[in-house]
Design a protein with these regions (language model features):
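Helix-turn-helix repeat elements of alpha-solenoid scaffolds
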Residues: 17-27, 57-74, 101-116, 142-155, ...
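Alpha-solenoid helical repeat architecture
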Residues: 2, 39-46, 78-89, 121-132, ...
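Alpha-solenoid helical-repeat scaffolds
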Residues: 19-25, 33-129
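Amphipathic alpha-helical segments of tetratricopeptide repeats
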Residues: 1, 27-37, 68-79, 111-123, ...
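C-terminal structural cap/anchor segments
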Residues: 223-297
Length: 364
């Protein structure tokens, strides 16, 4: 609008021969045009980057380099232009860049800086934008094992979304994961009930509904006494082929592991051995050792159950070196081949050993 008005007035004063006024609006038109070009360039960089990040969980070195370059360019553009939109694009490009490199500490810091910037420009306030930032901060806290601040951001994010909306369910999904990773299983159960008990839950996609079924399985595994009154068909879960069978990363391995955990609890040695071997073969075919470090290590730990004939002490001793490696690795950025850890593998392993020990000499 500024450019259009400046051009019209420039033309008007040129026709009248008023040089001073002509120059005034000519300068304004030049400044406006420069700003538009800067904003257009920043929009292009952000949208091009977003299109690549949104459709993939695995980021190439080329994309990493591009994201870094765009972040630096947007910084230079915003440095000399007093434009809310341009500064906002710079922050958004930066958040995408840190997402690509998987640095959640830097992402969290940039989110905090963005919130300060938005408070200074409150006239442009959007509830959805504030909810988006709070959600992103909660996810960062999940990967940084910061339950206290994660919970605070989760509660904050929920204020900005209508109950039953897609974004509301997204917040609850991440909130559930945060609680499970912090060992707050009772709270996780409350979040689960809040989501699945909502009247809009039935309208979620099949994929999203199944994700909540998987969450329920893990919740039932860690809280069998609390959930035994609920209808959860363990045998059906063990035997059914899920929607995610075509997804060779992400949630499908999490399903296979959950099924195996229930078999271990039931003491079904034959099926345990068969399924651990199937999981090993699956891992060698579809899970990259470099990109799925924690899952690959955990599968090796599970194999010690067979190798040590389900003897708790022997299993614990044989798996100890792998547990050390697992503890030293970090749960973080999910690549396209990484498994979603609904419960940290270290916690699952502790439960397995504890329940095996309670059976005294195992199943022999």
């Amino acid at each position: 609008i500024t450019l259009l008005c400046a051009r019209m007035l420039r033309h008007h004063y040129s026709m009248m021969g008023l040089k001073q006024e002509f120059q005034q609006f000519n300068d304004l038109a030049d400044v406006s045009l420069k700003l538009i070009r800067s904003e257009t360039k920043a929009e292009h960089m952000y949208e091009q980057l977003l299109s690549q990040v949104a459709r993939s969980k695995s980021y190439s070195q080329e994309l990493t380099a591009t994201a870094k370059e765009y972040f630096n360019q947007s910084k230079e553009l915003s440095k000399y232009q007093q434009s809310f939109h341009l500064h906002l694009l710079h922050y958004r490009i930066g958040l995408l860049y840190y997402q690509v490199i998987g640095n959640y500490r830097l992402t969290l810091n940039l989110c905090n800086r963005l919130q300060v910037f938005l408070k200074k420009n409150s006239r442009y306030r959007l509830a959805s934008r504030e909810g988006e930032i709070a959600l992103l901060k909660m996810v960062c806290c999940l990967y940084l094992n910061d339950y206290k601040n994660g919970k605070q951001n989760a509660d904050e994010a929920l204020k900005f979304y209508t109950q039953g909306s897609n974004n509301w369910f997204v917040v609850l999904q991440n909130y559930f994961m945060l609680a499970m990773h912090a060992g707050k299983h009772k709270q996780a159960a409350e979040i689960f009930e809040q989501a699945t008990g909502h009247q809009r839950f039935q309208y979620l996609s099949d994929e999203k509904s199944e994700e909540w079924k998987i969450y329920e399985a893990y919740l039932h595994y860690v809280m069998p006494a609390k959930t035994k009154g609920k209808e959860f068909k363990i045998l059906k879960f063990i035997n059914e082929v899920p929607i995610y069978s075509k997804d060779k990363g992400g949630l499908y391995p999490a399903i296979l592991i959950a099924q195996l955990l229930f078999m271990i609890d039931r003491g079904d040695e034959d099926r345990i051995e068969k399924n651990i071997e199937s999981l090993r073969i699956f891992s060698s075919r579809y899970l990259s050792g470099k990109k799925s470090v924690r899952t690959s290590i955990f599968i090796k730990m599970l194999r010690q159950l067979i190798n040590c004939h389900f003897k708790p002490e022997k299993v614990k001793a044989k798996a100890a070196p792998y547990l050390k490696k697992l503890t030293e690795s970090k749960y973080g950025h999910l690549t396209e081949n990484e498994t979603m850890e609904i419960i940290p593998y270290e916690d699952i392993w502790s439960i397995i050993l504890s329940r095996m020990t309670s059976k005294k000499q195992g199943w022999n």
